[in-house]
Amino acid sequence: MFLGFLLTLTLGGAGILPAADEEPPPEDPLEAALRIAYEGRKRIQEAIRDYTCILTRRERVDGRQMGYETIFVKVRHPLEEQGRVVQPFSVYVRFLRPDRVKGREVIYVEGRNGGKLIVRNGGTRFAHITTSLLPDSPAAMQHTRYPITEIGVLNLTKRLIENGEQERGNENCEAKLVQGAKINGRSCTVVQVAHKVRGEGLAYKTARILIDDELVVPVHYSAYDWPQTEGGKLVLLEEYTYTDLRLNVGLTDRDFDHRNESYLFLKSYSP
């Protein structure tokens, strides 16, 4: 879907097609990945108002390998009218696994609740405690690499674009683009970016992004550090997979209100 498109060469301002018996020059894999990401960002911003999904993540935090977490997510993208935000970026999550955090609920609405998360603890101890936390506070970041403000496929797309633009022209970077992968039965294109030599300031050795061919949005990202010993396995830094994406389901303010009767937050809590 994304490869093999016709490239035109320019000479003196005129468009010239390759001769019939000539193969068009292959597109650089990194540039192809960026093109897909730009298309995805445009589609998300113009056509996707909100969505629900399942996020499965695994991270290394402060040198500790965390286990898999499975999270149900609702996201509503911001909406502006005449330069005024009429619908802020909004997130609701409920942890499904593991038992340590099962049932935990978190709500974040940009610009509301004093900029804080509303959190119901969940898990096996003090499950119904409801409190407020700054998204980047030590308590909120205790078991994760990123604040909830960076969750979602649009933020993942933006990160892909930022990383790709930084790698342009980097001779230490090798990129590959492979079609035919599947996540949860859905066809995806794989983008792999790898650094050949360890260097100062490199965030990873190898990163893999899977882009849903139909939705044109990234649904998986994983990054690995160099092996701890010569010839050893790459060390997982972070892994995020979005499945069961349901787009434009019509989420409302009630979906991001802790007093929603289907949520288990303390209803009398005032952030």
Spans of features found by a protein language model:
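Bacterial N-terminal signal peptides
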Residues: 2-13
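A short, polar/charged loop/turn motif at coil->beta-strand junctions and beta-hairpin connectors
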Residues: 5, 47, 87, 185-187
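N-terminal mature ectodomain segment of secretory-pathway/periplasmic proteins
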Residues: 31-126
